[in-house]
Amino acid sequence: VVFDRQGNLYVSGGRSGRIYRVGPGGGSAQVVAQIEAHTRTLPDGKTQQAIVANGLAFDAKGVLYVADTARGAVWKMPVGADGKAGKPTLLAQDRLMDGADGLAFDGKGRLWVTSNERNALVTVAPDGKVEEVAKNGSEGPLEFPAAIVFVGNTGYISNFDNPRRDNMDADGKGALDGIGASIAQINL
């Protein structure tokens, strides 16, 4: 969810690819944009990723950005003063953004994307160039990073990793993988 300058609330619709808007006074949600549906098979060969409209963020000019988890992409679209969105255009699509989830702009106007499938953070330049900034183990504990928000020069990243027993031996003994829900930080 994200608010625009006029107080409209925007909500992503996940698999539907829809972006909804609720006006400042509340009421029913209106569909204002649509990202085309897409499904991708994950590396395990079994799991299907079909979430196309996920994290949302506005830049300083009022352009709406949408994380496309299934494609590993970010879309952008103009939003008019009436809260209606224009046609989505692809800003970037890159394997570095596999599992694109949360979006946020820092104080310098850089777009940050959490890549949950890669346990990474990337930035996307206005020309669509994608750069990896942190990966699990390099800047802190990133375990299925989901959302990101900046407060001053500090980015806070929510991790949704669930502890699981993936390394069990035949007797059912093994290490508990995953750190569970947590918050990571990155300082600019």
What are these regions (language model features)?
Residues 160-178:
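Short, conserved, GDST-rich strand-edge loop motifs in beta-rich repeat architectures
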Residues 84-117, 123-128:
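A beta-strand-loop signature enriched in Asp, Gly, Thr, and Trp
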Residues 4-35, 64-71:
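Surface loops at the rim/top face of extracytoplasmic beta-rich domains
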Residues 14-15, 69, 79, 116-117, ...:
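Short loop/turn segments immediately following the C-termini of beta-strands
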Residues 29-37, 85-93, 131-136:
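Beta-propeller fold detector
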Residues 23-27, 78-83, 124-129, 187-188:
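Short loop/turn segments that connect beta-strands within beta-propeller blades
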Residues 17-20, 72-74, 119-121, 164-165, ...:
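Structural signal for beta-propeller blades
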Residues 1-9, 16, 38-64, 94-111, ...:
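Beta-rich, blade/repeat-based domains predominating
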